[in-house]
Design a protein with these regions (language model features):
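Short, acidic/polar
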Residues: 117-128, 229-240, 259-262
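Acidic-and-aromatic substrate-binding clefts and catalytic sites of carbohydrate-active enzymes
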Residues: 3-14, 223-230, 252-260
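Aromatic- and acid-rich polysaccharide-binding/catalytic face
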Residues: 89-110, 236-259
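Surface-exposed charge patches
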Residues: 22, 208, 239
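Substrate-binding cleft/loops of secretory-pathway carbohydrate-active enzymes
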Residues: 40-53, 144-158, 218-253
């Protein structure tokens, strides 16, 4: 975080945390550990980026040729989009690519969260386990998300999608970008899955760990102030709140508005 000189999760870091816990114990105060070096939570101060599990997103390009590098390609036949696996002699191809942002991790992948817990929560527990459920109340998570302002993706989506719905996610990805028959049904399937993966593979794992270690979890996601904002980042905050012992929301600045008069 800005201005921090102490190395995150270093021995010096935990020595200072220990001083805070000791003082809180004397004063009868609770301690809540912030689970990240800044925000958004989930990448252990950059440590998990070394594993290469970068956050992924989808990008559509309208191109003049079929691309073997695309995850899925489509052509427009009449009013319908049809998936193709080779050159079709068309003048326009709708090629969907998987892209990566190297500054954050894929929270839809359960293994990433397991690594996050091992790199963060377990270290605090190793140091302060005698105070968990006593002076140490729990952890605060800050703005975990699957991405922002782009369509989310993860390497776990193809298998999880087929398991949930019985068909290939690549058959309908164009429906996330273009309108056609069946688009609403596909979008419903896709976003329900993304919501479940985000909740279960990230927050539920943290929640279950906290339950098993005698502490609580609180915090918030991001863009809670509108449904549109939620879809960009977490596919809805209400399912997520089930796995926060103390649900939270972040409303920055003192400007309050509503959906009628934003």
């Amino acid at each position: 975080r800005g201005g921090l000189e102490t190395e995150y999760l270093s021995e010096e870091w935990f020595r200072l945390m220990e001083a805070a816990v000791d003082e809180a114990k004397k004063l009868g105060m609770d301690v809540w550990f912030y689970d990240e070096n800044g925000w958004p939570s989930g990448f252990a101060g950059g440590e998990l980026l070394k594993e290469g599990n970068y956050v992924a997103y989808l990008e559509l390009k309208e191109e003049s040729a079929y691309s073997a590098d695309a995850f899925a390609s489509y052509v427009l036949v009449g009013q319908e989009y049809r998936r193709v696996a080779e050159e079709q002699g068309e003048t326009v191809y709708y090629n969907i690519y998987i892209c990566y942002n190297h500054s954050y991790v894929d929270l839809l992948d359960p293994e990433v969260t397991r690594q996050f817990i091992s790199s963060t929560h377990e270290k605090y527990y190793e140091r302060f386990k005698e105070e968990f459920g006593k002076t140490v109340a729990g952890f605060f998570t800050d703005e975990p998300q699957y991405f922002r302002e782009a369509l989310p993706w993860s390497k776990v989506i193809p298998s999880e999608f087929r398991k949930a719905y019985g068909y290939d996610v690549a058959d309908g990805l164009i429906c996330l970008f273009k309108s056609s028959d069946g688009a609403f049904a596909f979008r419903n399937d896709f976003w329900k899955l993304v919501s479940r993966l985000f909740v279960e593979n990230y927050q539920k794992q943290v929640y279950d760990w906290c339950n098993a270690h005698g502490c609580l979890c609180t915090g918030h996601t991001i863009e809670e102030t509108s449904l549109y904002g939620q879809m960009m980042c977490c596919a809805g905050v209400m399912p997520y709140y089930e796995y926060l012992h103390i649900p939270g929301i972040d409303w920055l600045t003192n400007f309050v508005y509503n959906e009628v008069s934003p």
